[in-house]
Amino acid sequence: MDFYKRALELKDETVADRRYIHQNAETGLELPKTKAYVMDKLKEYGLDPVECGEGVTATLGNGGRVLLLRADMDGLPMPEESGEAFACPTGKTAHTCGHDFHAAMLLSAARILKEQESKLKGTVKFMFQPAEETFQGSKNMIEHGILENPKVDAALAYHVSPGKMPVGLFMYNDKGTMMYSVDGFKITVKGKGSHGAYPHAGVDPINIGVHIHLALQELIARETDPAHACVLTIGQFKAGEAANIIPETAVLQGTIRTNNTKERELLVRRMKEVAEKTADVYNGSVEIEMISEVPPLICNPVSYTHLRAHETPEHL
């Protein structure tokens, strides 16, 4: 069977699936409308979907090695301003990262593979994942056994991308990292509140937070290999309610992104050390919480080789 030709035949249905999911964008772990739609479609195609944690899975095939096909399906907490007829009407959620595409494409893939199930040499397991944006979904489904029963031998996933790249272009990396690690952190600086006219009577957590922020940037400038891509960003800095009062606490939140495990471990460890020791110098303290701990995505060279073997010019 020409799978590419069959996919083109299903184009209108794939578009309709994408637009429904887009118009009903949901965020986080709980995606009731999206999950129900995915499960209904899989049942319509003859599969037997089940919940796996907060996600959905289904399996088909004839035994043997197991290939997992994964798509995320959550949106983002932001308003949509596209003006499209299928725009999300809530004003609070939107599919602006492409996960509506991913889920719709995997639904069509499931339909095509179900049609050809008798000819498959092996087993295909489908994974519809929530909460990719909050770094919770994959962990949730792994903890509920997505990689077991049957045990997964290899996995494939994809992500669409906007911009100037032509439609049909595939990007992958057979020599290293495809996507960076993401270690999200929250630093709560604890000081001592006082009136702004009497700073000597308190411990200023804003001052401590500023010094922590500046010191963290030196980790990239002086402690990581400039030939490697590493980024440390503080995206939130919140403190205080009044202009003339030194608050009790200040909160910094940020992310560390790297393309290798060695410097990921270095930066996470040094972030904690710098925050703790800087606070101590200024008579304060810190509480550090890791919000996310996602390793870098490194493409499997064997899977990459198999994928390349099935590419043909007319499909690229």
Language model features with spans:
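Acidic/His- and Gly-rich active-site-bordering loop/insert found
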Residues: 3-95, 100, 104-120
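Divalent metal-coordination and catalytic microenvironments
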Residues: 21, 69, 99, 141, ...
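Short glycine/threonine-rich loop-to-helix capping motif typified by GTGT followed
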Residues: 242-243, 247, 295-304
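A conserved active-site cap/scaffold subdomain adjacent to cofactor or substrate pockets
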Residues: 245-268
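Oxyanion-binding "anion nests"
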Residues: 263-271, 275-280
